[in-house]
């Protein structure tokens, strides 16, 4: 019998790449975003609809419908100059890609979990950073937002433009 080996968040990489051909997800050249510490939950339960009929005697019957993705996906980050620079570069890359004269080039985001054979990919629009709340005697955290423009998928791990250093 196969033994399940639980995974951890050690080694998780969150990255992005802009399409070079409209409608084709890049497989190489992903840029790792440093300083992130949390991801949104993509494990959404589907909506349901009542399918109860007069045949039911005690319980209702439901059918599964579509899963709902939040309007904005929230990524927690430890605010630092490297993170801010990388996020600004991401926003600029998105804006350049989406305005390309040869057709809008989507930005793909990747969540790569160490020890898992496939990564999670989705397209989205990164939102420029705002001003985070702060408290005395603490580190500064910020929430970075991405508005999803496509459904998440699992596919093979990418190759990276930067090695994560």
Each model region followed by its residue ranges:
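Extracellular jelly-roll beta-sandwich "head" domains, especially the C-terminal globular C1q domain
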Residues: 144-151
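Solvent-exposed edge beta-strands and adjacent loop segments
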Residues: 2-79, 123-143
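Extracellular/virion structural assembly segments
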Residues: 55-125, 129, 137, 151-165
